[in-house]
Structures are given as structure tokens and as C-alpha cells.
């Protein structure tokens, strides 16, 4: 949140020069405040787990956020009770005639499948295109980030033979940008994907700003110049046990996965993992919600272009 100070206070210019978020009294007096409207398109199999993880991060700000959950279609889910979906989820057609402050599109366990072979690919493209004109800022997570980068920029993902699974150390760039304000120079974040995007290729073929990457894992965080599209190729929302559960799932399916790196204490899968990425995840969501959504969204969403 910004600090409200007198227009004439000598400290004002100093704070602004240090990129501290200040707001003049004259601007503050003109602000109208209302709850933010945030939409979540949940593509993950375990929807209750995922919606809880994301809402936990969305709630960690002083802002009031009204959340609505949607699904891509009404197909039956193997991992989420029908009663839960019918009660708490809407179809896209029900919300598409409204405008929204923020939109989160989750990942999906589809990393080895070509995008055009995903049964809801056309619907996904429709939703992404809709979001460009009806949402102040959209946050794409993991598979959704890969899919959106391919659709919006024609960027081709590099599919690895082995899965990137574990906690990876990332480098922060453009430290003074609001999206990464407060980030450490390096931070840990969970990854669970087969795809990666090379930083140099993305820089040369798009207008995206790359805010974080890893030498052995490619881009982690990038955004369009106006931050209306923000891409996260990992899972800052994951609980401490999520990667463990995915690892066990892949073992049961006979996929012979490698043990997640930098995850189990002493590399012993019998020891309880510790979440060393939680503060970064909270800060990322807080910055996105504050600087990319709250500070730029119109009071009357009908004015959103």
C-alpha cells in the first residue's frame, strides 16, 4: 500500500527518487475505494487444494478481494466432487459479459501434450483473448503461462526429456520495478514442468520484460510492458507437501520421475519438506495485486478498455 504524504513535504521527492510508493494528498482525496473483483480459472485436477493455495496468497494484503471461481467446461472431474464444482464454480459463459480487476489462470498437468491436442485449447484461446479487453491484469501460472506465451507471442516452448521438479534458485532483474519490489537478489521457487523458455529467445522475439530466471531452468517471471499479462512459469502458491504428492503420483503412474531437487532435507524423501519459498510467493502476489491491479484499475470497471 502507498504511504500518503503532504504534496509539499520535503521527503516526498526523496522517497520518490528511491522508488518508494508514495501518494500525494491531492491524489488520495480523489481515490474511490471498492473491493477488487478477481476471477480464478482453475485448470488443476485437485481444485480444492489449488483454490485454497491461491486464495491464501490473495488474502495476504490489506485489500478486500471478491473472488469468483470458474472452470473451462462442465466435464466431470476425477479429483473434485461434483457437488463442490456445481456449488462454487461457474462456467465462462456466465462471467464473460462482466469486467474484472484481476484474473488468475492456473497450471495444468499437460506439459508433454501439444497445445493443439488439449481438448479445451480453443476455449482457452477464447478466454485469453477475452481477458485482454475485460481484465485489468491476468496472472498466468505454469502451463497457462506456457500456453499464453505461445498463443500471444508465437514463442515455442522447449520440451525437456526430464521434468523440472523441485525448488530452484532464481535471479531477480529490474529490481526497481513494482512487480519485484522487495524481492531478494536471489530467491527460491517451486517448479514442476517439462517446458522452459530461453531468456535470450524471449527477449529477442517479444516486448516482454524478464524479471526473474534461473540458469538451468529458464524464465520464471515475465510481464508485458503494461503488466496486463504477467507470466509465472512455476508454482509460488504450492504448499510444502505439493511436490511430494506429485512425485508419489508420478511414481504410481510408472513415469519413473526423478526426485525433486533441493526439496527433501538431506535428499531423503522420508523427511518432511520445508517451504523455503513462502515469503517470495506472498510478495509476488501482493505486488501483482497492488501494483498491477489495484493501482491502475478504474473505479468503474465499465471504463476498462
Swiss-Prot record:
It is found in: Cytoplasm. One of its GO terms (biological process) is L-methionine biosynthetic process from homoserine via O-succinyl-L-homoserine and cystathionine. Its main location: cytoplasm. InterPro entries: Class_I_gatase-like, HST_MetA, MetA_family. Keywords: Acyltransferase, Amino-acid biosynthesis, Cytoplasm, Methionine biosynthesis, Transferase. Pathway: Amino-acid biosynthesis; L-methionine biosynthesis via de novo pathway; O-succinyl-L-homoserine from L-homoserine: step 1/1. GO terms for molecular function: homoserine O-acetyltransferase activity; homoserine O-succinyltransferase activity. The keyword Acyltransferase applies. SUPFAM superfamilies: Class I glutamine amidotransferase-like (SSF52317). Substrate binds at residues 163, 192, 249. It catalyses: L-homoserine + succinyl-CoA = O-succinyl-L-homoserine + CoA. One of its GO terms (cellular component) is cytoplasm. The keyword NADP does not apply. Pfam families: HTS. Its EC number is 2.3.1.46. The active site is at residues 142, 235, 237. The record marks 111 as: Important for acyl-CoA specificity. The record marks 192 as: Important for substrate specificity. It is an enzyme of class 2 (transferase). Belongs to the MetA family. Transfers a succinyl group from succinyl-CoA to L-homoserine, forming succinyl-L-homoserine. This is Homoserine O-succinyltransferase. The lineage of its organism: Bacteria, Pseudomonadati, Pseudomonadota, Gammaproteobacteria, Alteromonadales.
Amino acid at each position: 500500500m502507498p504511504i500518503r504524504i503532504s504534496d509539499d513535504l520535503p521527503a516526498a521527492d526523496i522517497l520518490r527518487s528511491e522508488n518508494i510508493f508514495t501518494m500525494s494528498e491531492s491524489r488520495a482525496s480523489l481515490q474511490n475505494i471498492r473491493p477488487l473483483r478477481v476471477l480464478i480459472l482453475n485448470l488443476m485436477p485437485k481444485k480444492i487444494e489449488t483454490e485454497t493455495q491461491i486464495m491464501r496468497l490473495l488474502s495476504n494484503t490489506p485489500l478486500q478481494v471478491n473472488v469468483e471461481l470458474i472452470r473451462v467446461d462442465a466435464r466431470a472431474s476425477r479429483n473434485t466432487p461434483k457437488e463442490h464444482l456445481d456449488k462454487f464454480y461457474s462456467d465462462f459463459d456466465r462471467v464473460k459479459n462482466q469486467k474484472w480487476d484481476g484474473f488468475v489462470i492456473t497450471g495444468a498437468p499437460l506439459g508433454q501434450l501439444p497445445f493443439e491436442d488439449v481438448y479445451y485449447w480453443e476455449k482457452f484461446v477464447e478466454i485469453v483473448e477475452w481477458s485482454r479487453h475485460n481484465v485489468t491484469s491476468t496472472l498466468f501460472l505454469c502451463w497457462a503461462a506456457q500456453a499464453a506465451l505461445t498463443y500471444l507471442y508465437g514463442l515455442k516452448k522447449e520440451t525437456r526429456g526430464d521434468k523440472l521438479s523441485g525448488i530452484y534458485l532464481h535471479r531477480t532483474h529490474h529490481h526497481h520495478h513494482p512487480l519485484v519490489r522487495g524481492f531478494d537478489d536471489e530467491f527460491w521457487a517451486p517448479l514442476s514442468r517439462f517446458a522452459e523458455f530461453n531468456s535470450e529467445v524471449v527477449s529477442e522475439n517479444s516486448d516482454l520484460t524478464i524479471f526473474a530466471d534461473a540458469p538451468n531452468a529458464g524464465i520464471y517471471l515475465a510481464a508485458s510492458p503494461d503488466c496486463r499479462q504477467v507470466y509465472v512459469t512455476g508454482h509460488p502458491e504450492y504448499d510444502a507437501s505439493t511436490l511430494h504428492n506429485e512425485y508419489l503420483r508420478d511414481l504410481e503412474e510408472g513415469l519413473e520421475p526423478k526426485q525433486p531437487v533441493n526439496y527433501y532435507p538431506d535428499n531423503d524423501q522420508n523427511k518432511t519438506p520445508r517451504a523455503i519459498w513462502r515469503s517470495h510467493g506472498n510478495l509476488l502476489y501482493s505486488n501483482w495485486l497492488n501494483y498491477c491491479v489495484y493501482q491502475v484499475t478504474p473505479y468503474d470497471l465499465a471504463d476498462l478498455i
